[in-house]
């Protein structure tokens, strides 16, 4: 992994980039942010989920990142008011690396759906908690494009709770896929969403 010291040098070398002005300013800011997440020791200390995050050698050069950005950023969606975020997880196999092969610009609502359904809890299963007051398992799910979690019921055993959560999760995934199709994302991205499974901390 590239050291924090080298990261500091990279920042100094790119401050006078000709791409900082105009449209390229967005590109430069996103590049700086990904370097911070992948290489910044202070950032990783504050956000432990980025502890194992890294960046490919090519993207240490702003020109290389900009070349990829210009080919892959969906300006057409931005003009429609769709907020886009750089995602490194959907196309990877858990490697947590920023690279041309693992990154894609997704609508923020899609990115949020993926993230919310990966946060774990005491049961080991996302969206399932044991309610001590009722001695039952309570199920909630993050609905697509909604801020609050949907209540799905109370269950005597965790197997039933998991089954209900999986059913609801698949319903939400279908909504995400339909949305991406409307935005004309390619089939490979849609297929990746379709292949997402319920997060289990033991897996």
Language-model region placement:
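Extended, surface-exposed interaction regions
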Residues: 1-26, 30, 36-39
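An aromatic-rich alpha-helical recognition segment common to small helix-rich domains
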Residues: 65, 128, 139, 155, ...
